[in-house]
Every structure is written in C-alpha cells, then in structure tokens.
C-alpha cells in the first residue's frame, strides 16, 4: 500500500480480514524492525507465536529507493497461519436487535501498546461487548510529550433484547 490515503489502520484492516476468514485472533505488539517507521509498525502474534509484521516503511528506506510517498508493507508466514487455523466454520445466531457502538479516546503514555489496550478491553468481562478496535492514534502538541491519544470503538449487542444506555455505560 502507498500514498496519502493509505495508513497503518487500513493495512491492519486488510490483515484482520484474513485473520477473520481463518478464525484467528491476532495481537499486535510494537515492532523494533529497523526498516519500519518507529511507532508505525507492529509484530503480529497469534497464539503466542510471531507470524509476521506490518507497518509503514521507514522514510529513510523509502528514500533509498527514490520513493517520496508513505509506503506500507506486511509479511505474514502463511504456513504458520494455516497451521494455527482452527478450521471449520463457526456459526452463531445473528441478533435481531441493533448493536450499540461507543467511541472512546484515552490519553496514555507512549509506551502503552494499543494492542494491549484492546486485549484488556476484550478480557474485561463486559457482558454485552462483542468487539473492541483501535481506529486512531494521535500524537501532537495538544497531547503532550511522551503521550498519545488512542481512540477505540466498542460494539455491544444482545441476541435477546435491545440494550439500554445503562447496560453499556
């Protein structure tokens, strides 16, 4: 991927589409690979095993190839993915009731991994939460040195009824 419209989250979305199709749950950890832009790359882990990386190519590396646009790359070990694949389709009842989405932005220290925040949300025991995703990470003067704002989307639903605001607050 490349260009002004491409970003880390678009690339991550492509990878997550593959993981969803294979019934795999990925965890993303900050990558230290030297050819990836610091803070814009992630190692991909599934089942405690690193199966690849994704992220923005470091601008110095792109410049070595006379490329002046942002470049994004991913490498995944397909043999490892297929070995981890749970196989078989998993079916569950669709809810007849509308899901409720909530967005939340949290200012955290730069060293807090967004993937760890998603894992904490998913393991929180929130009764009706069906997904937690990071959709933006902002760094800037308004946030402060050594800090970042992580924006997350949470989806809540029930197969038996419409949820109230109190149930998802």
Locate each region found by the language model.
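A carboxyl-terminal module marker
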Residues: 2-169
């Amino acid at each position: 991927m490349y260009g002004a419209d491409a970003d880390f989250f678009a690339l991550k979305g492509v990878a997550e589409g593959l993981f969803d199709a294979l019934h795999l749950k990925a965890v993303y950890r900050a990558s230290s690979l030297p050819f990836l832009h610091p803070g814009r790359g992630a190692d991909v882990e599934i089942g405690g095993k690193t199966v690849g990386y994704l992220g923005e190519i470091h601008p110095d590396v792109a410049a070595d190839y006379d490329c002046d646009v942002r470049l994004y790359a991913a490498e995944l070990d397909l043999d490892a993915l297929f070995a981890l694949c749970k196989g078989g389709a998993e079916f569950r009842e669709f809810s007849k009731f509308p899901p409720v989405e909530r967005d939340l932005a949290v200012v955290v220290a730069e060293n807090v991994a967004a993937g760890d925040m998603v894992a904490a949300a998913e393991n929180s025991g929130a009764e009706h939460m069906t997904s937690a995703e990071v959709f933006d990470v902002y760094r800037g003067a308004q946030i402060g040195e050594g800090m970042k704002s992580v924006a997350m989307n949470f989806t809540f639903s029930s197969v038996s009824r419409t949820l109230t605001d109190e149930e998802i607050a």
